[in-house]
Amino acid sequence: MKLGFIGTGKITSAVVTGICKSKIKYTKIILSERNKKISKQLKKSFKKIYIAKNNQDIVNDCNWIFLAVTPTVANQIIHKLKFKKSQVIVSFISTMNLQNIKKAVKVKANISRVIPLPPISFKKGPIPIFPPNRKVKNFFKHLGTVVEIKNEKLSKNFWSTSGMMAPFYELLRTMSEWLN
């Protein structure tokens, strides 16, 4: 399994860390260079991690694609990429619904929305998935507790509340450093 991440922010870092610490079998993980600091840090920390020259190289070389960019960036780049029907595409994009992702991807691939939270790096916490998907569930069950959502409207509640997790943990980290 070749895993490709388009976007390398805090959530990608947490997901990749969780994958590398799990029993998920993969041949390589290819990261976009979007955040050079994070992509280089992940490559240095774990084996089988590579940094792509561009996003299309990730799509060309991987059978699992993780879309981990902001909604604004997603609208600028996803429709330009040439995906394959055989790929599993997992979107972490908060406000882009499944219908819009399908339009942007332009092929009938296996597409899911997933809401990873920072504790995924420790293989803990809930991982909401929409729509229910056996292959995606079997992948993410190694990284936390999978919650299958049958109604996309309900996932908006998860997106809204989970958006506060990263700032909350950042605040705790800052406070902890200050106390030391």
PLM features: residue spans?
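A general structural signal for well-ordered alpha-helical segments in protein cores
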Residues: 12, 39, 62, 74, ...
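Internal alpha-helical scaffold of NAD(P)-dependent oxidoreductase catalytic cores
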Residues: 100-110, 125-159, 163-180
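Short coil/turn segments
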Residues: 8, 116-119, 164
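Conserved beta-strand termini and adjacent loop/short-helix elements that scaffold enzyme active sites
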Residues: 32, 52-54, 114, 149-152
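A generic secondary-structure signal
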Residues: 18-21, 80, 178
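Rossmann-like NAD(P)(H) cofactor-binding subdomain of soluble oxidoreductases
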Residues: 38, 46-49, 55-129
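NAD(P)+-binding Rossmann beta1-loop-alpha1 motif at the extreme N-terminus of oxidoreductases
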Residues: 1-53, 57
